[in-house]
């Protein structure tokens, strides 16, 4: 833990917390799960676009630096949070739902982040799933597995009533 804390502080990390105490751990997990509402409070009328990145732990610093630079270059309000011990972090981007340009900028940012994670040997999504926004990367990342995935989906959902179009058309 001390080594992790030193690494965090050596890379401008702050407020490093961990606990062996059950109650304190629950508070830390609650804080992690309340991130959405904390971010939303920064700009109450905004919407939140959440994405994630997952890379080998050895590539984590580079990926986060890439995300930070893109966020800064695009002037986005986008806190980065995560439980980075597994190489996974989340970016929560605030945007104006009335401004179509905002959403397009965010989608481009998200796509650049996915391409960077793949370049670094990571995956297009850590926890958020493929869904609609990362469908295009599934074939790129897992080309030899697509037919197997489709056959499993067809076996479980022969009428295609569970999340139609979310991953496979």
Predicted regions mapped to residue ranges:
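Residue-level signal for pocket-adjacent positions within structured domains
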Residues: 23, 48, 125, 133, ...
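A structural signal for short, well-ordered beta-strand segments
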Residues: 51, 89-93, 128, 134, ...
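Activity-critical C-terminal alpha-helical subdomain
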Residues: 134-169
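Short amphipathic alpha-helical interaction segments
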Residues: 101-105, 109, 130, 140-144
């Amino acid at each position: 833990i001390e080594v992790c804390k030193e690494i965090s502080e050596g890379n401008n990390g702050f407020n490093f917390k961990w606990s062996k105490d059950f109650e304190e751990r629950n508070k830390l997990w609650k804080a992690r799960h309340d991130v959405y509402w904390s971010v939303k409070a920064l700009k109450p009328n905004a919407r939140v676009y959440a994405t994630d990145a997952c890379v080998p732990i050895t590539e984590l610093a580079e990926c986060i630096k890439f995300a930070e630079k893109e966020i800064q270059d695009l002037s986005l309000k986008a806190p980065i949070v995560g439980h980075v011990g597994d190489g996974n972090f989340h970016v929560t981007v605030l945007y104006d739902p009335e401004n179509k340009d905002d959403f397009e900028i965010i989608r481009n940012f998200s796509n650049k982040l996915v391409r960077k994670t793949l370049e670094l040997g990571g995956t297009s999504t850590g926890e958020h799933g493929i869904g609609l926004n990362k469908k295009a990367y599934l074939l790129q990342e897992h080309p030899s597995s697509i037919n197997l995935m489709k056959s499993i989906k067809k076996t479980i959902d022969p009428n295609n009533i569970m999340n139609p179009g979310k991953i496979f058309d």
